Amino acid sequence: MKDLMTSYSFTEKKRIRKDFGKHRSILKVPFLLAIQVDSYRAFLQGDVESSQRKDIGLHGALKSVFPIVSYSGNAALEYVGYKLGEPMFDERECRQRGMSYGAPLRVTVRLVIYDRESSTKAVKYIKEQEVYLGEIPLMTENGTFIVNGTERVIVSQLHRSPGVFFDHDRGKTHSSGKLLYSARIIPCRGSWLDFEFDPKDALFTRIDRRRKLPVSILLRALGYSNEEILGEFFEINTFHINPDEGVQLELVPERLRGEILSFNLTDGGSVIVEAGKRITARHVKQLEASGISALAVPDEYLIGRILSHDVIDATTGELLASANSEVNEDRIIAFRKAGIESVGTLWVNDLDRGAYLSNTLRIDPTRTQLEAQVEIYRMMRPGEPPTKEAAQNLFHNLFFTFDRYDLSMVGRMKFNRRVGRKEVAGEPVLYDKKYFSDRNDEESRRLVSKLGETSDILDVIKGLCEIRNGRGVVDDIDHLGNRRVRSVGEMAENVFRVGLVRVERAVKERLSMAESEGLTPQELINAKPVAAAIKEFFGSSQLSQFMDQNNPLSEVTHKRRLSALGPGGLTRERAGFEVRDVHLSHYGCLCTIETPEGPNIGLINSLAVFARTNQYGFLETPYRKVVEGRVTDEVEYLSAIEENQYVIAQANTLTDDNGQLTESFVPCRFQGESLLKPPSYVHYMDVSPMQTVSVAAALVPFLEHDDANRALMGANMQRQAVPTLRAQKPLVGTGIERTVARDSGVTVNARRGGVIDQVDAGRIVVKVNESEIIGATDAGVDIYGLIKYTRSNQNTCINQRPLVNVGDIVASGDVLADGPSTDIGELALGQNMLIAFMPWNGYNFEDSILLSERVVEEDRYTTIHIEELTCIARDTKLGSEEISADIPNVSEQALNRLDESGVVYIGAEVRAGDILVGKVTPKGESQLTPEEKLLRAIFGEKASDVKDSSLRVPPGMDGTVIDVQVFTRDGIEKDKRAHQIEEYEIKRVKKDFDDQFRILEGAIYARLRSQIVGKVVNSGVDIKKGEVITDPYLDGLKKSDWFALRMKDEVAVEAIDRAQKQIQAYQKEFDQRFSDKRSKITQGDDLAPGVLKMVKVFLAVKRCIQCGDKMAGRHGNKGVISNVVPVEDMPFMEDGTPVDIVLNPLGVPSRMNIGQILEVHLGWAAKGLGHRIQRMLEANAAIADLRKFLNEIYNHDKSLVGERVDLSQFSDDELLNMAKNLTDGVPMASPVFDGASEQEIKRMLDLAELPAGGQTQLYDGHTGEPFDRKTTVGYMHYLKLNHLVDDKMHARSTGPYSLVTQQPLGGKAQFGGQRFGEMEVWALEAYGAAYTLQEMLTVKSDDVQGRNQMYKNIVDGDHQMVAGMPESFNVLVKEIRSLAINIELEDN
């Protein structure tokens, strides 16, 4: 949205959208592919110096695996650094040759061998070497990867964040419906650790979801005794035992709450609590006020309490009672007898102090640390005999070693926050003070000195007990604070690390040999596992997807997609309703609208427009800071965790000119609730009304008037729009179209500003501004090659068209050329059609669409599809296949489109069944018929020993051959056609380089001319000393003689020398580049094993719109064309204009997508304004009048922020140019949730001199009579979707059959038949059509002999049929025999 002082770029001046937005956008829409591009850049760190690299990505993975030390410890392989080489082929060549676009990774490693004899580990020798570790795929600048010649996208994954989570079973486990609480520690890699309660309130633990053990076994394995465990988890009541009778309790009043005493509780004679009454909080306060420190209680009060420590007779050393045992009468007597003065008991009750760990200790069979570790060993490795070392090592490796366990930075941050610690950083392993204090190695001492008294496992168990006690809440796992994004870079790093770990194992074994045999690092490292892991991930991972390339929007959306599926994620079948649902925390992070319909609903989401990921991978969204009720322009990004504590106002909250909130109560969000708050309470405000939606949803105008289900369909169907022959900008847009087109990468944008020097259909040359030239070697020329008629992944056509003319002045970022579905740099997915909402003879029943023949004639929805057909010549056992024009038993006419090499000409128009590439295959020797013998005698060998296996045009396809590529294996002789293609390619490349050089050379000479004209000469060709250099003199001089000129002016001489060096350097560089390109073109191709030659033929198929094609608007209003009607029969307006499309009005009210009606009204107004401008231009109106009218359109209402278009910036020529572009309609922008109001639409209709109600009288095309009432008419942006009837229609007579059942295959791809199923059989039975049914079940299906005979009969003109035995009956017989039941068919 434009502010008053915005200056317009060259592209924007061509056509400005009238903006109805009322809220100034203070934040530009960020780069839409940033989530992909930034993530992979951080992974590669290719542009960072080796010493400056951070420990992430490739560098992090290499550092985590190296150094690799041999088993003996006498040799080590250390990592020094890495560098990425130059890719062998560029993106275009990779696409063409079916290769992967990547760069070689070379890692420098250092082999260190230590002296065995020396006691101090002295170094024996060091060898440093560069090792090749395979190809690393490179990302194209549009965020895609080219794998085996196809463009793929790695979709980001939304997975559960590492850390600790508390949950309960929602009462589903136990029949009583009791909530069983559990906690789970999830690391980034390593074993999962679960804690859970059982219905009897004992606490258990599981490791990696195996069988459960009492949690005390885990604590005992850490080295805690019973007393220490009880001391950690319980508060202790101390009782002093009187020598004769009675007990003194050290009183903590709070601990008595809820108890019922059997005696009066008194304070100096006054009774505080009577016997038999429950002690309440009020009583506790009284007790605290009275200051009583001890309470005399009878012995019975102590009975049944649990001891916190072992009670030992001091004189004899006898154990009187162990910790965690209950006190009874006998024990009290024994205590008195032994002279025990005091005992400690656990403070537990049934309300909020459960005796959970005490209960657990009672079912724990182990007594010592070793027993506990052995028990864990038995659970993890059942059946293996445990030894002391094995049990200790296994336990230590589970959670306490850096190699096997990694919580990750994110996990540690989440863990510490959840257990209530202040600091967020820490160690990636689980830490326990007791366990590490008892171990006496260097690593443990470091951890103890750093982390001190904390204990991760204890903190989790305490947290779980607190929640069970009713203090604390469980986590919501669907909250975005508990789900994080794993992007390309992180996934690639994990895969790379897995490959490196495989290498590490092999290297460890070889290192011991390196000590004795003097191996080099290259001999030690085998890079295959790394390369294989990376190839597998980019080629076949569930998240590596074939890019959706229907149109620019589908590309952008695919790259911004977030999937909950994939490795380490959910599965469709197991994902419940909660995971899929919209969550409060999605606001501003994930789109609440765009998600697929069907089994994946809610599991695949789209990133909201402004969302980004933070350093931990959590999604965050921007907000404007509000200070004391005033909105500032300061923007802060908050994640879902942080925004919980703030009050956030909506973007459309009313403010005055100073940003002060004007309403007395502001609608806000706070902790997931919607409420009204005074302005002083507000902390933040949304940055934009479209903050909650994704790019696709933000492209739907009047989205706020559509039902959510239909909006979802509208957002999804825009991605299926096929690029039309001529793109047409939407008359009613949302203002984000230009951003999407720019970021999608389909347009050509100027890298630097300058003047257009040359333009043709394939190339644009820009002479760069002097101010933007960098360095002395930069010639200041940018050359942009345009993509012409290339096939996309979805077989649509990618083509770029220049928008600029020679002499145009462009700035950096301006659009130089349009791509598919873009119009002057704006996304344009469909066409603006004149639409009427009315029934028409039943042709728009059930969402059908009635189309005017004019639309077909004008090619409004004609699309070009490019099909790639491949013919492969292989080496077979009987000999090699051959591509040639000499094919047996084929007529001359069938071969007339092939050249002598047997390959079709470019430009040939072909139809289904035509031969594209002639190919013959050797066939095995068989008995020759007499005729064949005769042919062989006449023509020699050839005629019979090969069969025709040519590539033909598939059924249902016709088109024009636009390109042929021939690939030949190295060492196989190239045919004539391959040489022709090669020569053409070399010529094209040579011309390209020559042109580039000429342009650069021209630019250098032009700059040199400006520096030397007017200077005095010392010496030179055809010029005397002392003369002045003039333009005519230079024009008559040979270019090479310029460098012989010498002047007095040192600066000019330097300029001449510099120009000469520049030209020589460029000449050398271009020669080198040309020879590289030439060798790439002429070298043999790397084909699959057994393939000798491959020919690819590209067909351009023109598809006009027809009955059966699917179309849709942007509001989920989809339909199928039912009829194409002559123009003269369509309803027409009073001025005779026939409508283009007739839609059913009943499709609107029940679907509740009213946005389409508003779009139609505003679109009509936009078109009407265009007509008014056209009339003014045709009448040659004064420029001032035109300026005034445009001002009235754009700058009428000052309440609209977007309405301040500064027309004074436009010169008269620019204004006229813009007016010409507006004659087709003045484009409008109605931003999402901030769109045009009813009054504004009415005003636009008035200004366009159209009825303000948006309805007009239509007349019947058949009779010319007016219809009974007025009709809603207007312009809607309508799309043709990639569900074309041509792709679906299919017919078969005979074709392939299934091997076992001998029934025809199914589906168009297999050239299958239509299944005559069970229900269809019932229908024929009901009609009594017995012979038809017999035919269906036998000769038309799987009666093999019958159908062959039938074929012969039809050829002979005999229409009889003999039904035999269906093959499926034989299959049934065989299957029953496999059950050992014999069935035989007897002839009766």
UniProtKB/Swiss-Prot annotation:
CDD domains on file: RNA_pol_B_RPB2 (cd00653)
Catalysed reaction, written as an equation: RNA(n) + a ribonucleoside 5'-triphosphate = RNA(n+1) + diphosphate
EC number: 2.7.7.6
Example GO biological process: DNA-templated transcription
Keyword Cytoplasm: no
Gene3D superfamilies: 2.40.50.100, 2.40.50.150, 3.90.1100.10, DNA-directed RNA polymerase, subunit 2, domain 6 (2.40.270.10), RNA polymerase alpha subunit dimerisation domain (3.90.1800.10), RNA polymerase Rpb2, domain 2 (3.90.1110.10)
One of the record's GO molecular function terms: DNA binding
UniProt GO cellular component terms: DNA-directed RNA polymerase complex
Protein's UniProt keywords contain Nucleus: no
Annotated family: Belongs to the RNA polymerase beta chain family.
Quaternary state and interactors: The RNAP catalytic core consists of 2 alpha, 1 beta, 1 beta' and 1 omega subunit. When a sigma factor is associated with the core the holoenzyme is formed, which can initiate transcription.
Task of the protein: DNA-dependent RNA polymerase catalyzes the transcription of DNA into RNA using the four ribonucleoside triphosphates as substrates.
Name of the protein in its database record: DNA-directed RNA polymerase subunit beta
Taxonomic source organism: Xylella fastidiosa (strain Temecula1 / ATCC 700964)
Gene this protein is translated from: rpoB
